[in-house]
């Protein structure tokens, strides 16, 4: 036994993991094995077994930094480290951080057993850190991991797991094996493959995504819509407007929702037309109406504001609330003034939704975000509201305008104010001083 190994053993007996790490780093392992000096003579198999056990002791009892340092030792030990590391990785009772390090270290070993173990962890673990580590480890193994997983696609029993594992390795090498399962009988296999393939800009993929729009499984259609929605570069070439707007009528809400998002991101009036056609239909349920309102908000054109204004006239409170919020988030200067006046007209209307406190509160917040001086009079009017939350939101919005404090002081001296407004102005001025 070398002198350094003897010192390492003593440090382990003392529980001095930091010192043990220092000695382990000095041992002639891996590339350093041929550079041994008198103190660190070449190690035999028995010595290597002892080094492995010492390193495992640090992994078991050390703190994060000590585990981080000892992780560098295991790859130098070679294949003898694989089995005990896999045992740690698969021990559900073991410390999660230790299992995380075991998996991370295994990512340094390009070995079929390692790949199988990491794949199993991806399938069974409910801990996000562990599964993320396993995916990263598989990715670091590169083509060998892809080849091993691709071979599992031939077996129906392992196909879903292999597809899920391949989907975690975002490398171009996974495209071909995943393309081989996009028509698999199992919907979960198809949807997983479609989701992963959508990450790549490869000419083989768009036709697959278009075909998947007609899949009988909603999960597959949903992933295809999401993937195509990210391909703005192919919007006209693939006629995505006409392909995706059909999915606005899908029986599955999540598919409809993703189709609306994709159309909204396109930012075209034609997309707004398609969204409004469904939004105004009495058959469209309120949750979907809200999704479509949000999507219209992303289009950001004057026509969008026209459609949102028309929708306000017959909207439920829930839908009207979302429209108010969407209009309040308008950032384009040319549209802000229009949005402000749409909201003012709505407040002054006889529509039932406009009379509710929650809508008035949202109106105040929207005007504060828009920052258009044309909303000041409407905000002052809200100070007369009997609901505290409406008044407080109006006050908060008024503080965004530099001249309103002076205007409120002048109003406070006006004897013609209604008692409710006079009280609201007084409260606002008092709040201003806080």
Q: Where is each model-derived feature located?
A:
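Active-site-proximal segments of catalytic enzyme domains
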Residues: 4-5, 11-17
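Surface-exposed polar/charged interaction patches
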Residues: 11-14, 26, 30, 91, ...
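N-terminal accessory/assembly segment that mediates macromolecular interactions
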Residues: 60-61, 72
